[in-house]
From Swiss-Prot:
Signal peptide: none
Functional summary from the UniProt entry: Catalyzes the GTP-dependent ribosomal translocation step during translation elongation. During this step, the ribosome changes from the pre-translocational (PRE) to the post-translocational (POST) state as the newly formed A-site-bound peptidyl-tRNA and P-site-bound deacylated tRNA move to the P and E sites, respectively. Catalyzes the coordinated movement of the two tRNA molecules, the mRNA and conformational changes in the ribosome.
Cellular component per GO, a single term: cytoplasm
Protein name: Elongation factor G
């Protein structure tokens, strides 16, 4: 079916864990006719949760792509995980999407991971609509949730629906644009619904919220503003145009409600995706750079008449077809069996097959065009973040940034004969998951896996066993500590070696400066007048990149500092990139003792929900874990405690929390920042 690009919607479904993302996606697929039955998460039958671990645990672990059609529009959907350990899946999905549906639990409201995924969407300027889900649950409060969206996310929630009833009495919604009630039929699994008059007890509230809707939306369009001043109302088409304009600009976020599990509210959500979220031609042109001149900017027009440009946002291994590279096409067309240029690597690769994916089901296609999200078979070198393009149009698109791991474990095969198989398995999994890192301990030869949390690493080791048939022994989780500097120092270092024949000579003067938390490592060269030839400067950066991973005092990677190469000297015969790499390493070692090295630890933002009677014990326990309580809020006889706690104090916390609350309290946490480790804790670590 040939569909114009203006009728494409590339969207993601994002939320905190258990808000109902996958259930919402399953209903979308059912009502659009993509599948003829509803897959339930709790039965392990959701089509989008296809991994064995997802079915067993009832959670989404990896982002899954699919395509469906609604009223002549093509909707490409990526269902993303809600658990913080898999936030990388959200990051890379949002990088290539034009819009998103943020799903909220109508009882819990805005939760910690809701805030995290919202910030990720802000980073890529992704327009959103909000769907307040679970309107049938006990304790649901639509209006509280709307207020939380405003206060916690700092956006203007534009309410375009009101719930009719709540909890077990939830029947449908009031559509504030048409000023009609929408009621769903239970016996048809929500496939049939009717438009009715608004219930009399909701008329005043509906009119109040419609006036707010008109006041907010009319300002998006001069024609609408004039019409609103004249008649104090707007025709439906003009009002929809205003809501669409404001949503795409980010002036406000349309808010809808429903219960995906009870089959209510999903069709209007589909209408809102079509009506209020952008097509590829509605968003800003993608801007890339020339691989040969990174200062030169190149704009990419979303047209199939332009040269082919795409971004690889995910790589995964399929046991039937091998390596799959998921791409979003930003311009041009691509045919199967053709070749593409990997601009970052300056290498051309051939494509075998091209697939349209529905979770892990594959459909072969011969051609894809601008706006499409497809999977390519046959690429050997492409990794997440690579730009693929026409050979005669080299361009680099902005890569994604991935968070640093916060936890690590030692992994070894149970039998030495499996050592090679383990290496192959982990290499493939690391290639799939940019938030997973692997290294080998130089002292004892142990393989170290680093990830975003205990669950992340648990899933990875489980996949090693299931998918690669390698049984492994796993060490206890360890915190991924870091080091940093606290003082600025200037180091003048000369590397000189003479042992017959050509020697080695390199002199560098480097200014090392501490940076704000989260800045990582930055390198800058201020060499002028040829003090060091251009071709030797990358050797300095490479030397620093390598040596910082080994730490300064405690052996942990060094972060949040800047190294500026300000001067140096070279020898016509004895200088080389290697000599300058060694000089940089020498300067770093000398700097380590002078720059006030400090050890850093990951701090987690923890949300605990507990019945009020256990609050005192839980607060005391948080304090004993070096925690800092940020806020407390009471809702529906439960207390919500928000705290910052070192990750080192959180291992096995769920068992302690259950014991203190007789199994009634729950918690979630996500990475917040790195902070200095108190000296007494450093001493304990050294002693242990």
């Amino acid at each position: 079916m040939e569909i114009d690009i203006s009728k494409y919607r590339n969207i993601g479904i994002m939320a905190h864990i258990d808000a109902g993302k996958t259930t919402t996606t399953e209903r979308i697929l059912f009502y659009t006719g993509k599948q003829n039955r509803i897959g339930e998460v709790h039965d392990g039958a959701a089509s989008m949760d296809w991994m064995e671990q997802e079915k067993e645990r009832g959670i989404t672990i990896t982002s899954a792509a699919t395509t469906c059609f609604w009223n002549g529009y093509r909707i490409n959907i990526i269902d993303t995980p809600g658990h913080v350990d898999f936030t990388i899946e959200v990051e890379r999905s949002l990088r290539v999407l034009d819009g998103a549906v943020a799903v909220f639990d109508g009882v819990a409201g805005v939760e910690p991971q809701s805030e995290t995924v919202w910030r990720q969407a802000d980073k890529y300027s992704v327009p959103r609509v909000c769907f307040i889900n679970k309107m049938d649950r006990i304790g649901v409060d639509f209006y509280r949730c709307v207020n939380m969206i405003k206060s916690k996310l700092g956006v203007v929630p534009l309410v375009i629906q009101l719930p009719i009833g709540s909890e077990k009495d939830f029947k449908g919604v009031v559509d504030l644009i048409s000023m009609k009630a929408i009621i769903w039929e239970e016996e048809t699994l929500g496939a049939k619904f009717s438009y009715e008059d608004i219930p009399s007890d909701l008329l005043d509230k509906a009119q109040e919220y419609r006036n707010l809707l008109l006041d907010t939306a009319a300002g998006m369009d001069d024609e609408a503003m004039n019409a609103y001043f004249e008649s104090n109302d707007l025709p439906v088409d003009l009002l929809k145009r205003c809501v669409r304009s404001g949503a795409i600009k980010g002036a406000f976020v349309p808010v809808l409600c429903g219960s995906a599990f009870k089959n209510k509210g999903v069709q209007p959500l589909l209408d809102s995706i079509v009506d209020f979220l952008p097509s590829p031609v509605d968003v800003d042109e993608v801007v890339g750079t020339d691989p040969k001149d990174l200062e030169k900017k190149i704009k990419v027009k979303p047209s199939e008449k332009e040269k082919f440009v795409a971004l690889a946002f995910k790589v995964m291994t399929d046991k039937f077809v091998g390596s799959l590279t998921f791409i979003r096409i930003y311009s041009g067309k691509l045919k199967s069996k053709s070749t593409v240029l990997n601009a970052g690597k300056n290498e051309t690769e051939g494509i075998g097959r091209m697939l349209l994916m529905h979770a892990n089901n594959r459909e072969d296609i011969n051609e894809a065009k601008v706006g499409d999200i497809v999977a390519l078979v046959g690429l050997k070198k492409a990794i997440t973040g690579d730009t693929l393009c026409s050979s005669d149009f080299p361009i680099l698109l902005e890569r994604m940034e991935f968070p640093e791991p916060v936890i690590e474990i030692a992994v070894e095969p149970r039998t030495t004969s499996d050592q090679e198989k383990l290496g192959i398995a982990l290499s493939r999994l690391v290639a799939e998951d940019p938030s997973l890192r692997m290294s080998v301990n130089a002292e004892n030869g142990q393989t170290i896996l680093k990830g975003m949390g205990e669950l992340h690493l648990e899933i990875i080791t489980d996949r090693v066993k299931r998918e690669f048939n390698v049984d492994v022994n796993i060490g206890a989780p360890q915190v991924a500590y870091r080091e940093t500097i606290t003082k600025s120092v200037e180091i003048d270092y000369t590397h000189k070696k003479q042992s017959g024949g050509a020697g080695q000579f390199a002199k560098v003067k480097i200014l090392f400066e501490p940076l704000e938390a989260g800045s990582g490592f930055q390198f800058e060269s201020k060499i002028v007048g040829g003090a060091i030839p251009k071709e030797y400067i990358p050797g300095v950066q490479n030397g620093l990149e390598l040596i910082k991973e080994g730490g300064m005092v405690s052996g942990f990677p060094v972060i949040d500092f800047k190294a500026t190469l300000i001067d140096g000297a070279f020898h016509e015969v004895d200088s080389s990139p290697l000599a300058f790499e060694l000089a940089a390493k020498g300067a770093f070692k000398e700097m380590a003792s002078k720059a006030g090295p400090k050890m850093l630890e990951p701090i987690m933002k923890v949300e605990i929900i507990t019945p009020e009677e256990y609050m005192g014990d839980i607060m005391g326990d948080v304090n004993s874990r070096r925690g800092q309580v940020l806020s407390m809020e009471t809702h529906n006889n439960s207390t919500i405690i928000l705290a910052l706690v070192p990750l080192a104090s959180m291992f096995g916390y769920i068992n302690v929390l259950r014991s203190m609350s007789q199994g009634r309290a729950q918690y979630s946490m996500h990475f917040s920042c790195y902070e200095q480790v108190p000296q007494y804790v450093v001493n304990e670590l050294k002693y242990n």
